[in-house]
């Protein structure tokens, strides 16, 4: 067996989501996913992980996607639910794209700077060969190639601008920077903002070739691009 979701179901999802975005749907979008369906094939040896970053970089992206395919094949999609996967490399993975170290344990991922630099010493640039950026693209490309539009592949959690900056200036330092160097914080934030869009566009260039539409870390479907504004850092200001 394969993933149980027909083109007709997809069309229904698209129509209901479009009406919801326009404020024309007289109910909330309700997604129900029930496990227990027979996947019709043996379970892959690759384990299931909540964080895609938990998989060793030596594991081919195609094997990660095969694990996802198996898991999706066990699900009954009800209501407004649809098959969707989220390449989860940690909240604010742009920090890793820009040079932070990505750390992992058995529960989560986080980012640390490789050097303790002052705000004025930070330099951000787009690096197409960054190991984590390449991994995200490889996984997304493998997913798109495997499913050819049957499964919605979400945008990874790029993060909020100040959240990304706080990975380079661990939060207590960035709090002081807001007082001591507010203009420098703004300047660095706009630099990250520009790069954020570069990363979004680069990943989207892969996803939009076959994806039914757009989702992010929330599986809310949209025919047009969207992403949530977010700033976890702001609660400490």
Task: State what each model feature region is.
Residues 1-50, 66, 71, 78-86, ...:
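Active-site loop segments of alpha/beta catalytic cores
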Residues 49, 53, 112-120, 237:
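Short, solvent-exposed coil/turn linker segments
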Residues 84-122:
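A contiguous, low-structure linker/loop signature
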Residues 53-62:
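Trp/Phe/Arg-rich N-terminal binding region typifying the photolyase-homology
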């Amino acid at each position: 067996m394969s993933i149980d979701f027909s083109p007709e179901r997809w069309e229904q999802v698209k129509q209901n989501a479009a009406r919801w975005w326009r404020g024309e749907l007289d109910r909330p979008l309700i997604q129900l996913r029930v496990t227990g369906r027979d996947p019709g094939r043996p379970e892959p040896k690759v384990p299931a992980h909540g964080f895609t970053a938990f998989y060793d970089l030596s594991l081919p992206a195609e094997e990660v996607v095969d694990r996802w395919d198996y898991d999706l094949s066990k699900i009954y999609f009800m209501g407004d639910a649809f098959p969707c996967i989220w390449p989860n490399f940690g909240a604010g993975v742009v920090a890793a794209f820009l040079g932070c170290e990505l750390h992992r344990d058995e529960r989560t991922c986080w980012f640390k700077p490789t050097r303790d630099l002052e705000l004025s010493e930070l330099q951000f640039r787009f690096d197409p060969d960054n190991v984590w950026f390449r991994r995200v693209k490889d996984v997304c490309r493998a997913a798109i190639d495997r499913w050819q539009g049957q499964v919605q592949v979400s945008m990874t959690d790029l993060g909020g601008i100040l959240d990304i900056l706080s990975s380079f200036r661990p939060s207590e330092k960035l709090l002081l920077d807001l007082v001591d160097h507010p203009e420098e914080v703004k300047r660095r934030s706009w630099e990250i903002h520009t790069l954020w869009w570069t990363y979004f566009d680069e990943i989207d260039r892969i996803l939009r070739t076959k994806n039914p539409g757009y989702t992010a870390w929330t599986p809310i479907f949209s025919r047009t691009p969207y992403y949530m504004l977010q700033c976890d850092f702001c609660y400490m200001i």
